[in-house]
């Protein structure tokens, strides 16, 4: 084997791994996090969990990616450990699809149909189409499709390069002796495991074995331990990922490890015992790419069928290794203050990570609303317990802003679609508004505290006016949060007219107070408090307007806030004017 053959082999391996990664990334981006959301929601049934694990892994072409995602689910409390077991078992089945794709290189025959099925025939076409779309396509989905096609073509080209590089070794006695050593089950497993740990992909390890099979020097007896070792080696990615995670997440990684170890040892013992008795004829025959795919699939499918009914064994083993603490609640959903749904493992799947950010932002919005409404209810009937809760909620919202902001900045550096980038920008804007609303809640609560400490109260007229104003504020807050949560654009159009009504209420209430002050019906001290509350109300409505405008802008692809606001509130905007008149009449001051 000369230097050029070595370079061809290593170069082919590099292209193979790059093509696999490119295709996998394209598939992940094309799915937009939908596959992960399906995994999260539809795994309550054990059989369904196995099937979904297999399906998702087959699509994204990586069992490691699936198991790491599952570790993230368990760490964040989204998925229980018992539900995770089935997904992990299914992931091992799904990863065998790659071997079947690579086995297409062995298709022979002169018919047009068979020729078209050969990767050497259609890979160049995929590469040409992929490059053309990548260079000319403007839509994100088109570019994702191009990445999938190019990744597949590069993967197949790398496979052919490796096969071509090792083909001359078919006549080498030294090469045959080396491969014969792998027939030793322990050595073969260790080599397969070690190589998989090195390249972090069991699919790639099995693919390289398929490339080596063209020499005819790889027997089935040598291939089996290598395949088994690759299955064990694939568990290291999840184990590494679980470092620093919760105890339950570590258990999920251990479930993957124990499942692969036990199924491998069980299969090896059964195979070698039966082979010693019956002397399987196929064991000494040269392995083929198709044969390797059959072994890989049969082994994993059989293991899933056999162990699924007794999958709780692996869960118990994980609990024996990492015992349950007295303070630990089994499969608990963490307190939202921990924001564990923002798991860094999800950053590898930006679409899903963004969905988790949206969920966290919705929680943040509701905490901010709770703080505001609780503070408003303190006006005229202050109590220390409720005031403490307002402070607690405001601090929680601040924590959310810090955590969410940092997470979104990390997420922004990942490969996001254009739509996801816009949604991320909207989230960054909105969480700032939610945080400011909670700050105004503190201000309102302090005004209520001052009234209580000084035994002050509003006049009956001022109280009636404030009741109307409060109704409008609660309405705009509820509406804007619902707009954010549901992305209801029709409802969003109602926010700006209501904000204009609130501006009018703010100005009118202050004007009326000055009149009462001149007539001696109100004190200057109460005037300051009323003005503070009214100003905070008006500023809350401004933040609600910002939230609704962000959602409307996202839909219209328009990010010039001031221009957009001017357009929708223009004097000739019929819909706006009608809605404004309706709300003005509804929130008429007495």
Task: List PLM regions with ranges.
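Cytosolic, long alpha-helical scaffolding segments
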Residues: 79, 105, 218, 244-250, ...
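Short helix-coil transition sites and intra-membrane helix breaks within transmembrane domains
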Residues: 24-28, 57-65, 166-167, 195-204, ...
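Membrane-embedded alpha-helical segments of transport systems
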Residues: 57-66, 85-102, 119-125, 155, ...
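Hydrophobic core segments of alpha-helical transmembrane domains in multi-pass membrane transport
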Residues: 8-21, 53-57, 125-137, 150-162, ...
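Helix-loop-helix hairpins and the membrane-proximal interhelical loops
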Residues: 1-46, 145-194, 212-215
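Interfacial loop-to-helix junctions that mark the boundaries of transmembrane helices
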Residues: 1-7, 109-121, 175-181, 221, ...
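Hydrophobic alpha-helical transmembrane segments of multi-pass integral membrane proteins
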Residues: 42-69, 185-208
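Membrane-interfacial helix-loop connectors
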Residues: 69-91, 95, 99-121, 159, ...
């Amino acid at each position: 084997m000369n230097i050029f053959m070595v370079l061809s082999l290593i170069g082919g391996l590099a292209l193979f791994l790059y093509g696999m990664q490119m295709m996998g990334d394209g598939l992940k981006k094309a799915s937009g996090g939908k596959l992960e959301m399906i995994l999260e929601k539809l795994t309550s049934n054990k059989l369904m969990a196995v099937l979904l694990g297999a399906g998702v892994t087959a699509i994204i072409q990586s069992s490691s990616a699936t198991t790491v995602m599952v570790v993230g689910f368990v760490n964040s409390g989204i998925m229980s450990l018992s539900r995770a077991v089935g997904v992990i078992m299914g992931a091992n089945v799904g990863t065998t699809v790659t071997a079947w794709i690579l086995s297409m290189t062995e298709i022979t025959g002169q018919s047009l149909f068979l020729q078209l099925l050969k990767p050497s025939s259609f890979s160049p076409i995929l590469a040409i189409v992929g490059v053309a779309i990548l260079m000319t396509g403007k839509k994100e989905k088109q570019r994702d499709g191009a990445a999938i096609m190019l990744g597949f073509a590069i993967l197949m080209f790398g496979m052919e390069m490796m096969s071509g590089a090792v083909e001359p070794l078919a006549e080498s006695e030294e090469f045959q002796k080396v491969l014969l050593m792998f027939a030793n089950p322990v050595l073969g497993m260790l080599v397969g495991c070690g190589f998989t740990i090195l390249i972090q992909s069991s699919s790639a390890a099995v693919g390289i074995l398929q490339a080596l099979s063209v020499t005819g020097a790889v027997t089935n007896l040598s291939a089996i331990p290598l395949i088994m070792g690759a299955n064990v080696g694939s568990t290291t990615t999840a184990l590494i990922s679980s470092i620093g995670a919760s105890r339950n997440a570590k258990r999920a990684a251990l479930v993957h490890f124990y499942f692969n170890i036990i199924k491998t040892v069980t299969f090896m013992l059964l195979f070698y015992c039966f082979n010693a008795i019956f002397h399987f004829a196929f064991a000494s025959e040269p392995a083929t790419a198709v044969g390797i795919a059959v072994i890989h699939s049969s082994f994993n499918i059989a293991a899933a069928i056999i162990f699924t009914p007794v999958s709780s064994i692996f869960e118990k083993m994980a609990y024996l290794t990492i015992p349950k603490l007295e303070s630990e609640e089994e499969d608990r959903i963490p307190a939202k203050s921990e924001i564990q749904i923002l798991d860094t493992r999800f950053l590898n799947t930006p679409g899903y990570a963004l969905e988790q950010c949206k969920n966290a932002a919705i929680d943040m919005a509701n905490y901010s609303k709770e703080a505001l409404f609780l503070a408003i209810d303190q006006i005229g009937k202050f109590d220390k317990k409720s005031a403490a809760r307002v402070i607690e909620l405001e601090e929680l919202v601040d924590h959310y802003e810090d955590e969410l902001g940092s997470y979104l900045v990390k997420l922004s550096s990942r490969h996001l679609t254009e739509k996801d980038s816009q949604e991320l920008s909207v989230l960054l804007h909105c969480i700032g508004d939610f945080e400011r609303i909670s700050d105004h809640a503190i201000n309102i609560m302090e005004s209520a505290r001052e009234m209580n400490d000084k035994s002050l109260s509003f006049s009956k007229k001022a109280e009636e006016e404030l009741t109307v104003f409060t109704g409008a504020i609660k309405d705009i807050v509820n509406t804007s949060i619902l707009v954010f949560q549901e992305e209801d654009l029709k409802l969003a159009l109602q926010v700006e007219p209501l904000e204009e009504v609130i501006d009018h209420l703010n100005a009118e209430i202050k004007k009326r107070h000055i009149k009462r002050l001149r007539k001696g019906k109100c004190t200057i001290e109460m005037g300051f408090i009323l003005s503070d509350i009214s100003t905070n109300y008006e500023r809350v409505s401004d933040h609600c307007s910002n939230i609704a405008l962000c959602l409307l802008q996202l839909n219209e692809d328009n990010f010039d806030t001031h221009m957009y606001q001017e357009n929708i509130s223009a004097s000739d905007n019929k819909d706006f004017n009608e809605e404004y008149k309706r709300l003005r009449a509804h929130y008429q001051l007495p």
